[in-house]
Amino acid sequence: MISNSEYHKEYMKGTTTVGLLCKDGVVLATDKRATMGNLIADKEAKKLYKIDDYIAMTIAGSVGDAQSLIRIISAEAKIHKMRTGNNMTPLSCTTLISNVLHGNRHYPLLTQLILGGYDLINGAKLFSLDPVGGINEESSFTATGSGSPTAYGVLEAEYRSDVTIDKGLLVAVKALSSAMQRDAYSGNGISLAHINKDGVKLYSDAEIEGFLKKINKKR
């Protein structure tokens, strides 16, 4: 038997996820590898989810815990829209997630989250949440998982405060690509999305391959 703290470390060590705040929206990206110890358990793991028309979220950690949380939050977002006629704002969604996580703080959900969204009044928003509900509103970029040190190196070098979504997509893909080359627990492709005034756009593998070719030409 392993302790809760040891269990937490085991499930929080893998993956790479990144989020960038752009002047016209938010970019989110993840790898696709799911690990169980030293075993690559899944090469097509879904770690990027559309929560609402203007909100998307990345997950790291225990898949079961994260998927359970996503089902709850997605349902609450739909109920909110049915009752009010409006989409839930990114801040409201983040606060709701924080409350759920904090309510389970004595036996926490083993997941670390990045939430990106677009508020038609307040613009683009980027948040990160820890397993017990702590919220950070990010003013530039963030990364989670075992590949995050490498990803942060690229983000620090490439990110600019006036970055657009078009440039942010390339930066995010470059950060993920670099992390996957150096981190054994990250790999097997990239999931990518942006959120702006028009909503959430999830990119296809072919589109992501196009971004990778652009990056490789510049190297």
From Swiss-Prot:
It is found in: Cytoplasm. It catalyses: Cleavage of peptide bonds with very broad specificity. One of its GO terms (molecular function) is threonine-type endopeptidase activity. Pfam families: Proteasome. The active site is at residue 15. It comes from the Archaea. Its main location: cytoplasm. Residues 1-14 form a propeptide. Signal peptide: none annotated. It is an enzyme of class 3 (hydrolase). GO terms for biological process: proteasomal protein catabolic process. Its EC number is 3.4.25.1. Keywords: Autocatalytic cleavage, Cytoplasm, Hydrolase, Protease, Proteasome, Threonine protease, Zymogen. The keyword Cytoplasm applies. The formation of the proteasomal ATPase PAN-20S proteasome complex, via the docking of the C-termini of PAN into the intersubunit pockets in the alpha-rings, triggers opening of the gate for substrate entry. Interconversion between the open-gate and close-gate conformations leads to a dynamic regulation of the 20S proteasome proteolysis activity. The keyword Electron transport does not apply. GO terms for cellular component: cytoplasm; proteasome core complex, beta-subunit complex. Coiled coil: none annotated. The 20S proteasome core is composed of 14 alpha and 14 beta subunits that assemble into four stacked heptameric rings, resulting in a barrel-shaped structure. The two inner rings, each composed of seven catalytic beta subunits, are sandwiched by two outer rings, each composed of seven alpha subunits. The catalytic chamber with the active sites is on the inside of the barrel. Has a gated structure, the ends of the cylinder being occluded by the N-termini of the alpha-subunits. Is capped at one or both ends by the proteasome regulatory ATPase, PAN. Component of the proteasome core, a large protease complex with broad specificity involved in protein degradation. Belongs to the peptidase T1B family. This is Proteasome subunit beta. It comes from Methanococcus maripaludis (strain C5 / ATCC BAA-1333).
